[in-house]
């Protein structure tokens, strides 16, 4: 079973795997542990990762990058429209209203949904993992920003399915970093001690996230998390780009922003300059050759200028830090350490802002690039039954409060209940009880839209079906289980109706007692029900019910029973209670239909097959080209002696014609055409190659056979001379060996004489394979006879027995060590020196 963690970044991706007792970040086919989040589509194939990044400038309109923020959003979303201005490729509205990318692929304009684009990238990462692990990969854990909403999370899950991956968990990036930090710590406080509080700061290319986590031995709890989804390394790049665009407009009279290719080149150079300024405070040059209109441009920048330029961005670093401390109810002195990850945290001014706020040094013990992927791989290992991992519990949180809304029966009023508050532990389940006589609908939405970086608060609608009144006409008691699952996604997990069946003989008593709660008010029966008597818009607060569950431990929190609950329990005992599961119809916001998802999966399979066929075609073409260059080079050197001048001229012309064909009409041919062309060349080239190989290897093969013949001849000569080493060999068998060796020598001499009479351009009389076969036959025939071991000479048994009889003690010697046991009944000395007498 594979254990893979994937850091699905905005700019780059990392893959970590669990193997050899640890976590290892793996490299791709370019020996690079970092795979760019880029997909370039061409007329015949796709390039993904490093190959696609090299085409960002050359294939501007069809190279997709920077698409992570488009997940789960409609085309009309303000964020999508903002990103649209930044992106050099075209965005398109899909039939379901979501955002798609319009590119040219296989010589036609085609739209791709964001789930398909991310699916392509994940499929590439899957392939890289399989190449490293040498086995299929299916299960994985994928990282996402902690601020992703339900729609965005479901979109990433769909992309994983498109790639053929089974995502065991969508893990918040800061939580993954916390796991990578905490699981190896041996000095964490025990469970009964005060936890160690650590702040994790992650500023990547597009977003800034902060979380506070409490650590005990074998336990991690996320206390609070804050973020700025619109602050990252690319904002600092944009500040530099805007500065140089203005400068070049004044200095060179060119408008860079009108030329997308030039703008991309400037972005690349500004990113390099930003990284150089992080390590160097002096003036640094910016030089770009043939930038626009054949102009070479140049400028310079230093760190002080850069920090002044980005002052407004640096001012946004502190507010999330203050917010996370307020939410966690912690002071600066409560923080044990501050860990930073993400590429943008390498900017000295960002580090300075963090240090100034916490008044303590920051720690850089974690790998800023790979910590998220390593944390995901650890989580995958914890979830996998194939790996034994140190026990470590992880409690994440809900970043936004979630509220349920439903219609009441009184004048079409509505009821509301906040089921999960902000920073509520997750994964978590709650059971809510409703009193209803008919099917009803629950609407889930984010309570405070101003806290959510998403324009629509809706999560989804859930219809509880098959709800009917009780047999006595009363409302049915419907228990609804709501859940924030391991992926951080809200759902209505199940619903059931409690059906009361009165026992015979107790009908009147039961009826009276079931009415008692009604007179006391239905709120007393259940903490989360709607007061039907008050119409209009009302709110109630969700309280912990006895059914409330914490998923990661499986324990249930039991509430102490009240007096009223005791009376209800007595009523239940007098009646038969039956729980019936109810069907739930879910309508989730921005959820892909199963048919659409299946079509995406099918299309991805077709594109993978197209890539495979194109690779095979290119490999066949490259094989022809390689053969032409290699053979032509050897034809003028090592093969020259093995071909006649006429044949050489003919073959040289054929090679030259093939080379010209490759760059003309043979530029774009089916795979089989290249295979046939290579076979045609080999038909003429292989005989020459064979003569050369035979000529090179024949002397060694002949020498080996000659040595073996000489060794056997020496044994035959020694046997004739009555050498005692071979006097055990059978004379008849030795005669057979002598005859075999004589025949072998005659065969060898005749073949060598015949070969010496031939020129190098002629086919050999004897092949190396025949000589090797002859050598093996000689070994098989002669060796069992001439190397038969001498029989061992055994000493006579009588002498051995005689010797053993005289090895005992002589008269007068002590024979205590070998004396036999005394007979029963006779007296003997004991260890204590006493004598036993009968």
Curated annotation (Swiss-Prot):
The keyword Electron transport does not apply. This is Heat shock 70 kDa protein 4L. One of its GO terms (molecular function) is ATP-dependent protein folding chaperone. Residues 506-566, 784-838 are annotated as: Disordered. Homodimer. One of its GO terms (biological process) is response to unfolded protein. The keyword rRNA-binding does not apply. Residues 813-830 have a biased composition (Polar residues). The gene is Hspa4l. Transmembrane segments: none annotated. Belongs to the heat shock protein 70 family. It comes from Mus musculus (Mouse). It comes from the Eukaryota. It is found in: Cytoplasm; Nucleus. The modification Phosphothreonine is found at residues 545, 761. GO terms for cellular component: cytoplasm; cytosol; nucleus. The modification Phosphoserine is found at residues 74, 579.
